[in-house]
Amino acid sequence: MRVVIQRVSQASVVVENKLISSIKTGYMLLVGISTEDTIADIEKSVRKVSGLRLFPDDSNAQWKRSIKDIGGEVLSISQFTLIARTKKGTRPDFHEAQKGHLALEMYDRFLDLLRQELGEKQVQDGEFGAMMSCSLTNEGPVTIIYDTKE
């Protein structure tokens, strides 16, 4: 499972010219689920996302506070392209990305656990399987790539 964690001052997602979700201070997550991922990977990712200290404290000392500590929001976007293999040729290979219906079940579980950890209203998401337009203001910029297999 791969999760790109971006610290943002705002983020939003639009599908077919309709605003689906938006947040203020927090994280925009891009979440990729592979055929090898299990519930253990989901649980590990939720712990990492909620506990990673990417925010400064009140004295502006960096890397002191987590999303949970600051009461921040999360906008999570499912993105199978994170699982692409690009080792050979010029066309990405998506064979290791989890199949749609299984990926949806796992992604929904990820969102459920994240909402349990951070609060129902703190976690927003896009539209699974849709073509989405995502925008964000990356603060720092701070962008972390987390992979449960590394």
Swiss-Prot record:
* Catalyzed reaction equations: glycyl-tRNA(Ala) + H2O = tRNA(Ala) + glycine + H(+); a D-aminoacyl-tRNA + H2O = a tRNA + a D-alpha-amino acid + H(+)
Q: What is its main location?
A: cytoplasm
Q: Where in the cell is it found?
A: Cytoplasm
Q: How does it assemble?
A: Homodimer.
> Which NCBIfam families does UniProt cross-reference here?
D-aminoacyl-tRNA deacylase
Read off the domain note. Answer: A Gly-cisPro motif from one monomer fits into the active site of the other monomer to allow specific chiral rejection of L-amino acids.
- Name the record gives this protein: D-aminoacyl-tRNA deacylase
Q: Which organism is it from?
A: Eremothecium gossypii (strain ATCC 10895 / CBS 109.51 / FGSC 9923 / NRRL Y-1056) (Yeast)
